[in-house]
Design a protein with these regions (language model features):
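Short acidic (Asp/Glu) and glycine-rich catalytic loops that position anionic groups and cofactors
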Residues: 13-22, 42-53, 71-78, 101-106, ...
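Structural motif
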Residues: 28-33, 83-89, 138-143
């Protein structure tokens, strides 16, 4: 994408949702509940378009999500002056309002995801194990561990058993190395 078009920020709706979720969890905020309902509607549009190709997903978003997002931002814009600037509610609202172009960018291309949850889920094991891997032995060993983790996550992303995938890849690489 970056070779054919300028780089474009596409914000993650899961991060926006999380801010309102935490707000609602902390004090049962009706404003946060309303925001969560509106964001859930956007995810419902995505569920409907899950198996669509890029152009169909784009058209579906234009027809179903665009007006919902405009209404959400209109609502937040009207609500913002009524919320104390230091309040957690203001921070959640401002997070969205200040990044409106990035949050609406996914509407412009059916290839853009609504969030980056798949990427975050793929790197979660690395983040969790980070302290365990501080002392991999050397920089080279750390690079090797990163290469193996890349293979494991690639296998998972393509619905393959990581153990079987690694066995096959490593076996084939040994065969290739031993051939004259």
């Amino acid at each position: 994408i970056f070779q054919t078009m300028p780089i474009r920020e596409v914000a993650c709706w899961a991060h926006a949702r999380r801010k309102f979720f935490e707000l609602h969890k902390a004090n049962q905020s009706t404003m946060a509940a309303e925001a969560l309902t509106r964001i859930a509607a956007l995810y419902e549009v995505e569920r409907e378009a899950k198996d669509f190709d890029v152009s169909q997903r784009y058209a579906h978003r234009q027809q179903h999500a665009k007006a919902q997002i405009e209404a959400l931002f209109d609502w937040l814009t009207a609500l913002r002056p009524t919320v104390n600037s230091g309040a957690a509610s203001a921070k959640a609202i401002d997070y969205l309002l200040r990044r409106k172009p990035a949050f609406t960018a996914y509407l412009d291309d059916g290839a853009f995801p609504i969030d980056n949850n798949p990427v975050e889920n793929a790197i979660r094991p690395i983040a969790i194990g980070r302290k365990n891997w501080l002392f991999a032995g050397s920089e080279t060993a750390g690079q090797r561990a990163a290469n193996i983790m890349t293979l494991v996550q690639t296998a998972k992303a393509n619905s393959h058993d990581p153990h079987a995938y690694l066995r096959d890849v490593l076996t084939l690489s040994l065969i290739h190395i031993s051939e004259p």
